[in-house]
Amino acid sequence: MEKGYSKWRKLDNAALAFPLVTDKNDTRVFRFYCQLKEDVNSAVLQLALDQTMEKYPLFQAVLRKGLFWFYLEHRDIRAVVKPETEPPCSRLYIPDKKSLLFQASYDKNRINFEVFHALTDGTGAMHFLQELVQDYLILAHPQADLPQIEHAEEITHGDKEEDSFSQYYSSDIPKDKEKKKAAVKLKGEKLVHSDMHITEV
């Protein structure tokens, strides 16, 4: 594991609820994907994932339950690319199962990245997918002289382990008294057990 990272870390405050409320009907998994102009080469995608994981060592972790809190523990488990066979956002975290909390998969010309929400938020997942796709395209087209992804700021080890909720939240800040508009409620027949249904357009 890259120097500068601990072998375990507590979940930040914003992520603590996810392990408690997840089940087979509410997986707390979300997905980003990138659609290419060509079919995905699975062998090249695996090499790209290996490279990307070197930049994201915190993702090589399993979720464990301690006496007082959940925590992420580093494990030498290789992330393996798979063809897409399961429904989108299928369950990734199963209590007491020592498995990674994300999955990279592919289907025809699409690269999928699914992640359990306790591991990272949308920003972290988007950065990971950007790196993965960049590494894939560079490996697949070595003569193309493709541009590198430019991030606004270089992310340090401390930034990746930072609990932003604790750093920026304060109960002393007065709440906004402005009346909020009612949320939009979707119409239609509900699925049995509140199962998820996904429609792509």
Where are these regions (language model features)?
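Flexible, P/S/T/G-rich "lid" or insertion loops adjacent to the active sites of thioester-utilizing
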Residues: F165-V201
